[in-house]
């Protein structure tokens, strides 16, 4: 801390010396002459240590000086003062018993606490002129001794190369910085290793045996540094991505038998099947031989297209395959003819439309009285006559399923059309 003038020992006055203190307060004034400099020794202060507020550039012809806690000069913030004439020390309400004032105006604070951190004001009383005085301010920050950190992990047993993990350095410590070490070295540059904004959390993207650790974190501030114990991730063996093989991706409805197989084969895994994101329920229709690795559907309907997934699991977790969706071939169902009107008058428009559920879409054709008219879903006759009366049939065919179906209706066309004006008696 350097050489100090010995603290006066001739006389000490407690707060009861209020009259003398009041007389000192009369000399307070803004600085007019000397530049007072205050520095802390040591410059970085940790809790429980001592700090000396060392004063430089003291002006000449001094009467005394007063120390305040904070930047407000009043009796409440008054710590202690020194009167040169008589070497008298006076203690104020802010005195804690740990402050020592020296004849060179320096202030020693012992066993500093968090409450001691902050601003201090030194007011110097100059003799010869009661209206002259010099004021200096100083602020110091108190740093806590850093605690021994520990590392917490979002996953203790991540799956190799498959899972992201975040490591956090605990505890969160104010006014401190965080450093990370892997295998005793500072972190390498890698897109798989990313730090949070404060460096307190380390993100590992796809942990491998090369990035499993050991890791250490360090908490550091200007007065101390502490490093954690090594932390190593327990990597689980990588699960292979399963996939589904199937004997027929385009089965015919209620006709073809489907065999699903979950690959790869292993005695170390269990197998689970999923349909539409739900675990496949137990059903007499579904057979699962060979420890559930093979799924057999004796038949399939248009409502069972999927998606299907298989999952392989070990004692720690599982992974699913990409979804597989079937293209179930069906139909054509019984066609529908619209509109279903059967009575028309000569001169009216005949427009019929035919539709049937089918995959792939069916081929359509129209016949009248058994005679082919056209191919397509729609039949249009601009002006019908009585000659157009008869049996209209829509036939549908699906070449993929080999199925056919038809629907017929009878159309009757009466004589000459009656004008609307006559029909309503105009």
From Swiss-Prot:
Disulfide bridge map: 169-217, 262-310, 354-394
PROSITE patterns, per database record: IG_LIKE (PS50835)
Positions glycosylated per UniProt: 61, 104, 111, 199, 268, 303
Residue runs in coiled coils: none
Family matches, as SMART domains: IG, IGc2
Annotated CDD domains: IgC2_CEACAM5-like, IgI_hCEACAM_2_4_6_like, IgV_CEACAM_D1
Signal peptide segment: 1-34
Cellular component, GO annotation: extracellular region
Name assigned to this protein: Pregnancy-specific beta-1-glycoprotein 8
């Amino acid at each position: 801390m350097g050489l100090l003038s010995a603290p006066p020992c001739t006389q000490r006055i407690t707060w009861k010396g209020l009259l003398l203190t009041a007389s000192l307060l009369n000399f307070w004034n803004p600085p007019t002459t000397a530049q007072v400099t205050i520095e802390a020794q040591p410059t970085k202060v940790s809790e429980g240590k001592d700090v000396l507020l060392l004063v430089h550039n003291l002006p000449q012809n001094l009467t005394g000086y007063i120390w305040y806690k904070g930047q407000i000069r009043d009796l409440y913030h008054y710590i202690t003062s020194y009167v040169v004439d008589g070497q008298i020390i006076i203690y104020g309400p802010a005195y804690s018993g740990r402050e020592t004032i020296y004849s060179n105006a320096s202030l020693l604070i012992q066993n500093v606490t968090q409450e001691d951190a902050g601003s201090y004001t030194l007011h110097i009383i100059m003799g010869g002129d009661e209206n002259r005085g010099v004021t200096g301010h100083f602020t110091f920050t108190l740093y806590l001794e850093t605690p021994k950190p520990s590392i917490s992990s979002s996953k203790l047993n991540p799956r190799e190369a498959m899972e992201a993990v975040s490591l956090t350095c605990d505890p969160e410590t104010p006014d401190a910085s965080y450093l990370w070490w892997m295998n005793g070295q500072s972190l390498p540059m890698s897109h798989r290793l990313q730090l949070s904004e404060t460096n307190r959390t380390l993100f590992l993207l796809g942990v491998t045996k090369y990035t499993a650790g050991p890791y250490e974190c360090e908490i550091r501030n200007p007065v101390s540094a502490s490093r954690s114990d090594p932390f190593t991730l327990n990597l689980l063996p990588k699960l292979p991505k399963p996939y589904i093989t199937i004997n027929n991706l385009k089965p015919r409805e209620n006709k073809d038998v489907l065999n699903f197989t979950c690959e790869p084969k292993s005695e170390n895994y269990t197998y689970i099947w999923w349909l539409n994101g739900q675990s496949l329920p137990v059903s007499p229709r579904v057979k699962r031989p060979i420890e559930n690795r093979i799924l057999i559907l004796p038949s399939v309907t248009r409502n069972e297209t999927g998606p299907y997934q298989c999952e392989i699991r070990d004692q720690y977790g599982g992974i699913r395959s990409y979804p597989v969706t079937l293209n179930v071939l069906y139909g054509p169902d019984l066609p529908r003819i619209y509109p279903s009107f059967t009575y028309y008058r000569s001169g009216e428009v005949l427009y019929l439309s035919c539709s049937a559920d089918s995959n792939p879409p069916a081929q359509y054709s129209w016949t009248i009285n058994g005679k082919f008219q056209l191919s397509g879903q729609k039949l249009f006759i601009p002006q019908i006559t009585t000659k157009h009366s008869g049996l209209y049939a829509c036939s549908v065919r699906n070449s993929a399923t080999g199925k056919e179906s038809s629907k017929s209706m009878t159309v009757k066309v009466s004589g000459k059309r009656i004008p609307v004006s006559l029909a309503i008696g105009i």
